């Protein structure tokens, strides 16, 4: 029996019609092979012979697959027909071809065989008989004998079935698809006619031109010769007087007009049928093209588009060319239809183009038609010109409006980026430039210029002569940096973006790389606002000596720690960092060389010296040096003054040193502090507390971060949780804006409570401030209900050395906790009316002040880094009892000299009855009566500062808010 699946057949009995059938084998998997239709004679022979012995049949209608007889077909054989040929079984039963599934019908006709027609037309007699025999359920009796030729043909066909066809044979069997000729316009007669007409028209035009030239020469000769014949003169004047009206009616003019119209129509005709002409030429060269051809019309349009896009003056040149062509063609037409000269005709053509009303004076049909045509073209040309001019003006104005023009400035301050600190930063820069009559600040950000100007216009302060210029662009693109004259700026400030810390610092690093790539170099230094302290070394490594970094997030955290331990310090920092009052300045005074620092300290009536920039140590700034330090040549003095031109050294005043009060060393007491929220740099804040607090202190951390996650984050930050010696960490989980969660905490027992801007909502300053204010109100309300039943704190808090009424007023009988709330938006702080100074709302305004100060003088960054660090010198608040006695009369210079015995520099004071501290007071030599309720602001060494901070803990009254919640 034959197995025809997959294009193979196994003959039995040597290919004869007789023999015992082979044992049945399971059908092989069908193979995806192409089919080939066998000729009708072979198929009919197979039908006549193969039905006699179905088990030994090997021939099929298609060489790749043989249909099994109905009796021998295995049951369950899946067969799917592509189509329904005329010779298929009507019921689609066992006689259905099992090869037809290989090629789906929805893919179109098979390349190797034509699809059989669906119509029920009669095939030839032999084919119909064979199909009828194959469809009959009862096999017909086979012939007794078979001719030798038939057997040979059957063997050859069997060999074809068994042997897989090669690729070349399959290609030969597949008829080529019929060529589909695209419909085209036959240009042969039209092209010949067009060429003939063109040649004739051109010849007639030349002949007419020559004839008109000869006629003009005759007219000129008639006008110049006095003996000319009267008749000739009359005819000449007649021709000139009629302005060509007789010439219009002549056959010559008609031929010239027709030829001119045909000449103008030729380009239009070529543009319309150029593709058909090109296709005809290519078809004559090659009959069949395998590559896709682009029409010439599209090619021309593409070239024109590239030309207009790549050349800035392409539109203007095209308009100029069109105008020249219009004037030239119009001049030629006027020259033909009128009796004027060629140059005169060109001039008339130009006047018709320039002014559409000039053609009204023309006489005669020909000149009028030509003049109207020229005027119409002129109106089109001028309309196009107006459109181009309007587009150019609009594009230029739009470029100015969008901030794409170049900034031509020198010694300006350049701000790269946009953030919520920009408003307060511009305010501080405007105040700093007030003394010089104002300056220029350029802002480059990836925002629309109009939006930036609108936001800056909403700021409620006067710029005092400082102009702010906004430009839209990316700080990462060198072209945009050159647009704002980055190489000529005296200072560049890179603001942190509103993204998370790592993304913001990564962007700042890319901006620094862009700045270092400026070929012209940078004249000023670069101040970079960083978000994470760990990324600071990388930025400094890339930028080099020009880079000054201000780690905003860490600065806020450390300031909050200092303000929690010393309430009132935030206001003092605002006075020093802001340009409205006193600030840091560094300047060299040669007349002070050789003087001791103790004498330099009292040499400035309008400033307070607090450090020295040592020239011999590569410009290192030494804060709070010893009294015996002698200024060398090149050393500069660091002072706190109103402005850089408001102080000069003077002669030494007379001071009374007196005796320093003998205050016993107070003991240090443990503190209990609560952190509400989670910050990225909370590990740094914990280390600052570890350095400041006494042993046995507790730090409660209340937030929504799981305890294991907290330990992991603290460990990743580089902190040894089990290595803390002074503080003990207490973890509590909860939401700081849910009252039920807050009531589970002993809020009345905490000495200080810090409400942190939560890390989960720090990207939105509005949400962060809302959470902070809600937490502050809830804590105050819970404390007010619990504190009356609470006993007073230990009398150790009220030892004899703390007599300030300002401090006693904040300590109060109920001993309320100090609450420091972190507010990111300065506008939110304006909604809160703070009672006294304890519950101070800290905002990003301090960071903006630090950025502005470092931008004005990069050396100040060394001072701020030391004052913000947990080591070195820091700013503190001291009670007057450490420097004077009750009602003692002293000058400010006397107190400065006494403070030197404690290695401190007094920079200001606050009287008992005042709400504002005075930094760098005037009239320092004036003697006044002091009270023990007064306090002084000093710069002290880290050891002394930590010691005295613990003895002057301040407490506050309840906070009063002006807004209603």
Curated annotation (Swiss-Prot):
The record's note on what follows loss of this gene reads: Defective in mycorrhizal symbiosis.
Cellular localization per UniProt: Nucleus membrane
Pfam families named in the record = Castor_Poll_mid, Slo-like_RCK
Q: SUPFAM superfamilies recorded for this chain? A: NAD(P)-binding Rossmann-fold domains (SSF51735)
The source's superkingdom equals: Eukaryota
**Record has Zinc as a keyword:** no
| Residues spanning the membrane | 187-207, 251-271, 317-337, 369-389
Compositionally biased spans, kind Low complexity = 1-11, 52-66, 118-149
Do the record's keywords include Transport?
yes
Query: Could you tell me in which tissues this protein is expressed?
Result: Expressed in roots, leaves, stems and panicles.
Regulation: induction: Not induced by mycorrhizal colonization.
Q: Where is the RCK N-terminal domain?
A: 410-551, 670-818
Q: What does this protein do?
A: Required for mycorrhizal symbiosis.
Protein's recorded name:
Probable ion channel POLLUX
